[in-house]
Amino acid sequence: MDFGSVMNQAATPCSPAVNYELPSPGQSITKQVDTPDATRSPRGGQAHRKASRSMSVTAAMESSCELDLVYITERIIAVSYPSTAEEQSFRSNLREVAHMLKSKHGDNYVLFNLSERRHDISKLHPKVLDFGWPDLHTPALEKICSICKAMDTWLNAAAHNVVVLHNKGNRGRLGVVVAAYMHYSNISASADQALDRFAMKRFYEDKVVPVGQPSQKRYIHYFSGLLSGSIKMNNKPLFLHHVIMHGIPNFESKGGCRPFLKIYQAMQPVYTSGIYNVQGDSQTGICITIEPGLLLKGDILLKCYHKKFRSPTRDVIFRVQFHTCAVHDLDIVFGKEDLDEAFRDERFPEYGKVEFVFSYGPEKIQGMEHLENGPSVSVDYNTSDPLIRWDSYENFNIQREDSTEGTWAEPALPGKHLEKEVGHTQGPLDGSLYAKVKKKDSLHGSIGAVNAARLPLSAAPNHVEHTLSVSSDSGNSTASTKTDRTDEPGAPGAPTGHAVLSPEEKRELDRLLVGFGLESAPPMHNHAPGPAPARLPAGPGRHVVPAQVHVNGAGTPLLAERETDILDDELPNQDGHSVGSLGTLSSLDGTTTASEAGFHEAPRVGSLSSLPNGPASYNGAEKMLKEGLYEAEPLSNGAYPYSNQNTLMGHHLRDPLAHLRPSASAQEHLAGYPQRQPASTSPAWLQPPVPQPYLYGYDLPSAHRSQSFPAVGTAKYEANLALPQAPARSTSSREAVQRGLNSWQQQGGSRPPSQLHDGGLESHSPSLSSCSPQPSPLQPMPPHSHSMPEFPRAPSRREIEQSIEALDVLMLDLAPSVHKSQSVPSAATRQDKPAAMLSSLSAQPLSGHYAQPTPQVVQPRSFGTSVGTDPLAKAYSPGPLVPAARSTAEPDYTVHEYRETYTPYSYQPVPEPRSYGSAPASILPLSASYSPAGSQQLLVSSPPSPTAPAQSQLPHKGLESYEDLSRSGEEPLNLEGLVAHRVAGVQSREKSPEESTVPARRRTPSDSHYEKSSPEPGSPRSPTVLSPEVVSTIAANPGGRPKEPHLHSYKEAFEEMESASPSSLTSGGVRSPPGLAKTPLSALGLKPHNPADILLHPVGELEGEAGADSEEEPRSYVESVARTATTGRAGNLPAAQPVGLEVPARNGAFGNSFTVPSPVSTSSPIHSVDGASLRSYPSEGSPHGTVTPPHAVAETAYRSPMVSQTPSAHSSYQTSSPSSFQAGTLGSPYASPDYPDGRAGFQPDPQARQQPQVSVVGVHALPGSPRTLHRTVATNTPPSPGFGRRAANPAVASVPGSPGLGRHTVSPHAPPGSPSLARHQMAAVPPGSPMYGYSSPEERRPTLSRQSSASGYQPPSTPSFPVSPAYYPGTSTPHSSSPDSAAYRQGSPTPQPALPEKRRMSAGERSNSLPNYATVNGKASSPLSSGMSSPSSGSAVAFSHTLPDFSKFSMPDISPETRANVKFVQDTSKYWYKPDISREQAIALLKDREPGAFIIRDSHSFRGAYGLAMKVASPPPTVMQQNKKGDITNELVRHFLIETSPRGVKLKGCPNEPNFGCLSALVYQHSIMPLALPCKLVIPDRDPMEEKKDAASTTNSATDLLKQGAACNVLFINSVEMESLTGPQAISKAVAETLVADPTPTATIVHFKVSAQGITLTDNQRKLFFRRHYPLNTVTFCDLDPQERKWTKTDGSGPAKLFGFVARKQGSTTDNVCHLFAELDPDQPAAAIVNFVSRVMLGSGQKR
């Protein structure tokens, strides 16, 4: 580890690992020491830093061996120790400091440990939060946010609370935290805090700047920019192709060096290059090419090492950390002053710089051939050398620094490697009570408490593979339980107590504090916001490449296993818990899976072992728990040292009250897994962060992730994401790329998350979205830019908190997602909210692009969307909103000049629609407008071209000419850097002749200059037609949220993105990349939560209110959008009005609607809910918009997914002509060329109209994304089991199409379509409702349903005893006598578990989990798409919840009859997925149904697998021969095993069956073609169990009850021997003896189950017995006490009726025993139990 020294593990057989980064004995370590020249600021332009800080001061500061304790402010104390401190004196100092703090502050302080974890720190202080990260490094953005939130929450909880920052090593860590908190607290900007902020600034400049690292300053710059909105979020993944070193460092005696790169994403290695041998005089630079491009998203660390020639050590040449959210150029340059280590190293040339060349796709960049190295540079690809493979960070914090097993030698030297983690804890030595074996339970259990303090997320070696698999843990992972927090509904903000400043005062304060930190520093990446100066061939200046060419979502990024030509570093601990492992480290068990961790490395709030009082596995957390500070939620992954998780973010309160935690991190939002466990009352801030593993994680490419939130939030999450896997070298680059993308998709399938999940994050964060082209923070704002006034109003603390939340969400979005459990938050964990799981921040990219989730309207048709009523709906836009000029009835199909493609769903706005003026483009804001009842036409406005920045905000002036609008919206597209010519070329490629005149700037290989010709605005590119294949793909996969991993090749995607013409470039502003919206959080009008709420409100307090209070203002932008998008509140509109979603073009045609940045192909058909193609969007010239029949809009509003458009020019599939379908042609088949049978068409489905559920069309385009629509199938199909355990509420009406949106759907019925979506649904779900259901029994533990013990929830498998009087004999006909009748408290149908997650893969499986893709027509395609042939070796496709892209193979036009008649209207999984039924029950359900009927259940024989039972027309011949006689109806139900693996789910034993990302995908594919099944599956449109119940006659109801049985908890009182007595006398006698007995018997709670087999008693606590069974034939009588005596309960809850049954004494044929019980649950009265027993006895022929 670049962090500590080697530990001698005396207690274990392990030998110390070699530390390859130690300098050779005689070598001086110039690079490791902060030398005097440190005074040179990383950015020469930071004039405010005084040059007076001399070298001697710097050296003295760093070399000082004294403890340094400074009161930065009265309530923030910094305690710093030099890294060279001797252990003995260090321990002594620790004790002294602890004594001083206790004497002065008592227990009112929290110690934030920013260094390695230590046992003594945990023991000496009452409250410790571990946020450590490696010395001299910078923490993940999300960790910075977590720390700030934790500090703010604690400081605001009470006036006497104090924060202590503990650091051992370089002061840079303190500086990052202090500077970040200064910016964070500046948001609230109260006058009484000005002095504190000034003090923080002073501390930072005096103590930290001289010794800090450039990357640390860069991250502070990111954080402040994201908070203020000055940095626009780029939430797209980037593919790194080249790393060019200009200038050769002299690390060899004769000059030159032997460099090799290691790239880390979220502190996990994702790439290791070969070793380049460069002679000092050979040339002036080296180009390290990564082929195919390496997908990067989130927090990136690139470390360049020099491999010594004859010594087995390596030197660090330079190190640089950056976050992709702030990279707005495809070519960025870091000068020497920006490179960690190198900036003070004389061996690195002064003029040296490092250039990174990115693109939006993995394919080779055309025109970069000149970057090849000369013949004198040789490359050694032998990366098996441990020196090269060694990961310096894998063991960070695995063990405590002061662990008794060994001592730390030279703790200060980075590069020391900790001993590999032992397989067990050390018992008493390490503070544990007992030594515990750490099981590598990659399949199912979690590691238990041991894990809590150990596998740091970052250490999880297999992250790469892990990420890939969306493995479906069939329920073992409990991670989401604790880790996820759902959105906070928003607690009332506590008064802040600070005077709010007026804008003038605020400006004054700003002037006072100006110059702090990096505000004045130039942006750390060299992309200047303004026109970029031409690049100089050499020199320290950076190349400014402002052109922001990325269109969100353009390249189908799937974070999948990526392959580099050189294998990735080996991932050592292949343990199921590693971050990568998507399995969830179950938090209950103490481990979290990365997924639930939300992909954030959790800051380990108390890493369960850091708090002193308690077993080592608990942090002070226990104490805090005891003190009520926070819930005992084991820190999952608590040991992740470099955890990106916010503490706050990471903790998801388990409590249902989301709103209690004002500072809940974005994770809550994102990851919002609604899983909160009710009982805790602890404040969120103290909860151990749950690493949401990549929940929200990284939606990588997830469609929903693209949100424009402030990078901060998103970035954080991403940081934790697992990186794409490096595939084996054997596969081709294209395949690797494809795999990588798929993996992305899988991961992305969340948040959100995030982040992510979310995970991804859905585009919630308002903060980033301000659209105004804002100059980069460091540059003055161009006068013309319409940026929001700096402080339009003083935001309240709640708003600030909220904005932070939004940021968090954003971070999540960016974080690389791990899909596994991450995307699967367990079923709704909150009782009051159906939890939609993040699909992975998470969210999975629905379409494989980063599409922006469009908010979904989840409204039963009787309600209108509640947009208008949402307080947030009022546009808080920085600039004046454009009047809603045509918001009423006239359809507006104006073609906007710059045509950023927006999803054209516009419904007509109703008068006064309120839109978010500044809605982040990232969220496809649906316009909240409603159409008047009379004009229910679907307006489709032609989407503006993708080039327009995705700004949702219109310029200040009212409706200006389109020209002006586009001008203001578009910033000049100045491309500089290696990529410039490429972009320009691409643009010209698809432009009309006029457009092609835009000259491209090219850089000549020789001089690194760009030849730049002035760009001319081009005319809008003609609309790209959506290819029918895409449509068919969507149609075919309604439930699986099919992602089209490759709708078009990356090249096409890239070209498409860039083809957007730079229309109207203004010379003044910088072109903001689409999707990068810049809205200061404060402008959103969000109501932040007050941190005090966390501490003050008991957790259960507001539980029921979340869904109920429709008046409460949305807590967060996300929430407001969700509310707006869903019709959760009835009454906002006249009941029958259709909901109108208007997606106005940005130019203001619909001024008041939300602008939806997502591009929608102008001609691509939108399919109406009823399945008919409404008609394609009008082509550019089409004068009329398509009109949807009113009923389609009103009743079914958009359920069908939008089709993702494919670039026409290069796509290999045929595109349909732009002509629009007229409304009258709704029924006409829309045949897809891919399906000869026309399967792609949608047949109108008459039933569809009756579906009240409405989901917005699932096409989400990321704002700015090139015209490709990112489509999410908006069917209400729950995410596949692999993804979220979906809350299955039968009533759920719609699934939010993308996680970002529905995350907070308020509608009580909306089942999250994809886990990440409804992640935070607010509807309250009663514990008995199906929302609690889990996919498999194992999953029931921690989350809501897992909380069965706490909530009293009974597993759905055994109904409670019916209490309806009509049910019992002697009363009227038992209507509801069937076991699942409504009389049962559990409710029917059985709660639908969220589909199960895939199990975590075992270590062995993980390493083989790289799917390969074959290519068709030069495009990568999955085996499915290439003709369904069996996957080539090892090429199983890992679809994340989506089906293969059928658009790959082009077929002649097809006849309509084969068109897939798949219904998009409703989620059908609740009908066919019955996890808890037995094989026999499945046969009974199916044997009388038509062939093709099927049920999928959890396999009882194979853990983690599923059983598919399907009815066939005739049994196999072998069965016919064997059973020539008798009834063969049971044989007509055939059974297949669906196995889960890292690649997904597939039918076992069928070689030509592909792997599917989820059960939904498997089901929908087999409903289209049988593949290996006997016939096609017929997707049911109603619940077979309901049908069976309807058909059953009342006469056999007793039989049905017998089969299923009933159960409940009762009090067992006593057993009295009766000899041969039975009947009422026996009961009476037993009661009499019991009541007079002395002492009175103690009542014990037992589970009382009655079935056809008899009565079974289970003592849950095993006090008296474990289980007793009384066969039915031994039970002779059962009744209430004839004398109606009562039992007095000890809990004082009142008397309870007594009842009993008489059974034969075991081993006797004559003697009886009377067993007495008292009723326990008022809902299960004794009379109901007795009646049921009697009924069962009657059914078996016995008498009472």
Curated annotation (Swiss-Prot):
<keyword id="KW-0727">SH2 domain</keyword>
<feature type="region of interest" description="Disordered">
    <location>
        <begin position="1156"/>
        <end position="1437"/>
    </location>
</feature>
<dbReference type="InterPro" id="IPR051484">
    <property type="entry name" value="Tensin_PTEN_phosphatase"/>
</dbReference>
<dbReference type="InterPro" id="IPR036860">
    <property type="entry name" value="SH2_dom_sf"/>
</dbReference>
<comment type="subunit">
    <text>Binds to actin filaments. Interacts with phosphotyrosine-containing proteins.</text>
</comment>
<feature type="region of interest" description="Disordered">
    <location>
        <begin position="666"/>
        <end position="686"/>
    </location>
</feature>
<feature type="compositionally biased region" description="Low complexity">
    <location>
        <begin position="1421"/>
        <end position="1435"/>
    </location>
</feature>
<keyword id="KW-0206">Cytoskeleton</keyword>
<feature type="region of interest" description="Disordered">
    <location>
        <begin position="467"/>
        <end position="505"/>
    </location>
</feature>
<dbReference type="Pfam" id="PF10409">
    <property type="entry name" value="PTEN_C2"/>
</dbReference>
<dbReference type="InterPro" id="IPR003595">
    <property type="entry name" value="Tyr_Pase_cat"/>
</dbReference>
<dbReference type="GO" id="GO:0004721">
    <property type="term" value="F:phosphoprotein phosphatase activity"/>
</dbReference>
<protein>
    <recommendedName>
        <fullName>Tensin-1</fullName>
        <ecNumber>3.1.3.-</ecNumber>
    </recommendedName>
</protein>
<feature type="compositionally biased region" description="Polar residues">
    <location>
        <begin position="728"/>
        <end position="753"/>
    </location>
</feature>
<feature type="region of interest" description="Disordered">
    <location>
        <begin position="982"/>
        <end position="1077"/>
    </location>
</feature>
<dbReference type="Pfam" id="PF08416">
    <property type="entry name" value="PTB"/>
</dbReference>
<dbReference type="InterPro" id="IPR035892">
    <property type="entry name" value="C2_domain_sf"/>
</dbReference>
<feature type="compositionally biased region" description="Low complexity">
    <location>
        <begin position="763"/>
        <end position="773"/>
    </location>
</feature>
<dbReference type="InterPro" id="IPR029023">
    <property type="entry name" value="Tensin_phosphatase"/>
</dbReference>
<feature type="compositionally biased region" description="Low complexity">
    <location>
        <begin position="1156"/>
        <end position="1169"/>
    </location>
</feature>
<feature type="domain" description="PTB">
    <location>
        <begin position="1607"/>
        <end position="1743"/>
    </location>
</feature>
<dbReference type="GO" id="GO:0005737">
    <property type="term" value="C:cytoplasm"/>
</dbReference>
<feature type="region of interest" description="Disordered">
    <location>
        <begin position="724"/>
        <end position="797"/>
    </location>
</feature>
<feature type="compositionally biased region" description="Polar residues">
    <location>
        <begin position="1060"/>
        <end position="1069"/>
    </location>
</feature>
<keyword id="KW-0597">Phosphoprotein</keyword>
<keyword id="KW-0009">Actin-binding</keyword>
<feature type="domain" description="Phosphatase tensin-type">
    <location>
        <begin position="58"/>
        <end position="230"/>
    </location>
</feature>
<dbReference type="GO" id="GO:0009986">
    <property type="term" value="C:cell surface"/>
</dbReference>
<keyword id="KW-0963">Cytoplasm</keyword>
<feature type="domain" description="SH2">
    <location>
        <begin position="1472"/>
        <end position="1581"/>
    </location>
</feature>
<feature type="region of interest" description="Disordered">
    <location>
        <begin position="569"/>
        <end position="589"/>
    </location>
</feature>
<feature type="compositionally biased region" description="Polar residues">
    <location>
        <begin position="1370"/>
        <end position="1380"/>
    </location>
</feature>
<keyword id="KW-0378">Hydrolase</keyword>
<feature type="compositionally biased region" description="Pro residues">
    <location>
        <begin position="774"/>
        <end position="783"/>
    </location>
</feature>
<dbReference type="InterPro" id="IPR013625">
    <property type="entry name" value="PTB"/>
</dbReference>
<feature type="compositionally biased region" description="Basic and acidic residues">
    <location>
        <begin position="1004"/>
        <end position="1014"/>
    </location>
</feature>
<feature type="domain" description="C2 tensin-type">
    <location>
        <begin position="235"/>
        <end position="361"/>
    </location>
</feature>
<dbReference type="InterPro" id="IPR029021">
    <property type="entry name" value="Prot-tyrosine_phosphatase-like"/>
</dbReference>
<dbReference type="InterPro" id="IPR006020">
    <property type="entry name" value="PTB/PI_dom"/>
</dbReference>
<feature type="compositionally biased region" description="Polar residues">
    <location>
        <begin position="1344"/>
        <end position="1355"/>
    </location>
</feature>
<dbReference type="Pfam" id="PF00017">
    <property type="entry name" value="SH2"/>
</dbReference>
<feature type="compositionally biased region" description="Basic and acidic residues">
    <location>
        <begin position="1041"/>
        <end position="1054"/>
    </location>
</feature>
